[in-house]
A protein has these predicted regions:
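Conserved "landmark" site that anchors the functional core of diverse proteins
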Residues: 1-135
Length: 135
């Protein structure tokens, strides 16, 4: 069992990708303090805060299978952390996945509680998105 979360701010680690490049500023996901919506359920925890901007708002992805903890960003720009009863993606990009170590915390988060996401490892960057790593 996971210990009850007493803090008002819950910290969650996120593995970047696979489609974080579909956001204008993927790091905005981890630079925003989100609030858990009262519209959350076993399908997903909806986050409220400053909407993320899609890089290609007119493009759609085919539906894809995902795992519990995947973070998809629908057209309104407000992330949804998918829960145990999640469907396929519904054409929305998955920009990260909550780490295995933190996934059980998601079920403990109450509506109105604040959530801060952190990259669990550095993001891969596309050319033109800042520093790239040479191999």
């Amino acid at each position: 069992p996971v210990a009850a979360i007493e803090e008002h701010l819950v910290e969650l680690r996120v593995v970047p990708g696979p489609r974080d490049d579909w956001l204008v500023d993927p790091d905005a996901l981890v630079h925003t303090i989100w609030m858990a919506s009262n519209r959350s359920d076993r399908v997903g925890m909806r986050l409220q805060g400053r909407p993320l901007q899609h890089r290609w708002p007119d493009r759609q992805l085919p539906g894809e299978g995902v795992t519990r903890g995947a973070i998809q960003v629908p057209p309104n720009g407000l992330p949804v952390i998918l829960g145990p009863d999640h469907p396929i993606t519904g054409s929305y990009p998955v920009v990260g996945v909550i780490t295995d170590e933190d996934i059980d915390k998601v079920a403990q988060i109450r509506p109105g509680q604040y959530v801060r996401l952190h990259w669990a490892r550095p993001r891969s960057r596309l050319p033109g998105q800042g520093v790239t790593q040479a191999w």
